[in-house]
Amino acid sequence: MKYTVEDFYSKKFEDESNEILLNERWLFSEKAMEDYVIQITNISISDYISYCESLPSIPNYTSKDITQLSSLYDCTLGMCKALKGVDHGLSYTEIATKLHDGQSYTNTPGALTKYGENQVKTASQLGLTLCIKDLWYLSAIGQIFPNLADDIQNKYFSICLLRDPFYSRVLCSMCKQETNLPNYMTILSETTQKRRLSSCKQLINFFIQQCNTESISIYPITTNFN
């Protein structure tokens, strides 16, 4: 089957694969999932931008969609490693503990819980994890993600952000004009905006790098507070 931009935005194959992975694991095909990601990342980023800009509406975003992370690695490859082979799902605290991987740490239980929450929710924004009844699992893409080449990983993150309710607005704006990121974060207090700016910029950088790779012109992103 040949997958299209529309297929990616529909999430149909991903949803079906997640269902198989969770309920009929023996039927899950890593090769089929890898082929899907390779196909959708072979499509030009400009095609995804055009599709995103053509959408009649984009779902509203909330404060929960504005990323807060501590470690980009722990949200991506580290998360895939921590949750790999876990069939029963993990809580925020269990995720944080596995991400520390037996290292000594001084975090309080509350801090551990918050760390796990922030990293796994960011991983979910990037399509790598999913939540069922307050427990977290690797998605079908998360299962195979470490097997992919670095350039495919970066391209996947870039297009994933283009279907996110928060980032799609920011990225499409960057394609048209200089964009001030705090203007999209006004549902947060200014203090919280400043705390989350770095996290958001780390994810946006995937898109910037991909546009540079494909010679797509975009405008700068700024972080000015009025």
Describe every region a protein language model picked out:
Residues Y3, F8-N226:
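Donor-sugar nucleotide-binding helix/loop cap in glycosyltransferases
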